[in-house]
């Protein structure tokens, strides 16, 4: 069964609200922060401490790499990650 090019439809673009990354980063960081505070305040959750600290550190590392790549894309570096046009300021 062959499908001709004229019959293939492109999927619709995602709504802009689903392309925003900063709310996802904020919610994830807040969730790890709440879990870390709970792990250090509630004695029964002491076994969570290493996991929550690792979660905070991993989130911080990932956010740092994203911001670094965003800065590289803004200045037009050749090695910058592709596809960050959504986050660049129109100048």
Curated annotation (Swiss-Prot):
InterPro entries: DUF2530. Keywords: Cell membrane, Membrane, Transmembrane, Transmembrane helix. It is a multi-pass membrane protein. Its main location: membrane. It is found in: Cell membrane. The chain crosses the membrane at residues 22-42, 53-73. One of its GO terms (cellular component) is plasma membrane. It comes from the Bacteria. Pfam families: DUF2530. This is Uncharacterized protein Mb0903c. It comes from Mycobacterium bovis (strain ATCC BAA-935 / AF2122/97).
